[in-house]
Amino acid sequence: MKVIETKYNGKLEVAEDRLIAFDQGIPAFEDEKEFVLLPFEEGTPYYTLQSTKTVDLAFIIVNPFSFFPEYRVKLPEATIVQLNITNENDVAIFSLLTVKEPFSETTVNLQAPIVINANKQMGKQLVLGDTAYDRKQPLFQKELVLAKEAK
């Protein structure tokens, strides 16, 4: 067990097998190499991706398919190798939220999903270069806003 201080839940004991290694960090947070996935609030679709090193670094994330069933992510071979993915059922995809006031104006980044190999506890933020998905998609808008034409 590892004791960590969290932004939203205070001090927690976390099993070692729940720690997720981000070997390259997350863009703009390259020194942050270890996170834990926590429910944000019981009974909601929101999670916290909490740094185990920095208390105030906690991203609010969601499963984008819960909000946008037509959303698609094709993992590049390099990501499959980097995260040691051998079974697609081991892959979890999440998207970062930008929480706004009022909450109904919150946006989700569909252009750079968080990809986690749940079996190996390895993750990365994948920047989709060849996509029409927006990085500021309104979360509660049913239709996807396409930022640009896909190449």
Swiss-Prot record:
**Top-level taxon in the UniProt lineage:** Bacteria
Q: Where in the cell is it found?
A: Cytoplasm
A single GO CC term, please? cytoplasm
The UniProt record lists the keyword Chaperone: yes
Keyword terms, alphabetized: Bacterial flagellum biogenesis, Chaperone, Cytoplasm, Translation regulation
Q: What is its main location?
A: cytoplasm
- One record GO biological process: bacterial-type flagellum assembly
The function of this protein is:
Acts as an anti-CsrA protein, binds CsrA and prevents it from repressing translation of its target genes, one of which is flagellin. Binds to flagellin and participates in the assembly of the flagellum.
User: Could you say which protein family the record assigns here?
Assistant: Belongs to the FliW family.
Q: How does it assemble?
A: Interacts with translational regulator CsrA and flagellin(s).
| Protein's name according to its UniProt entry | Flagellar assembly factor FliW
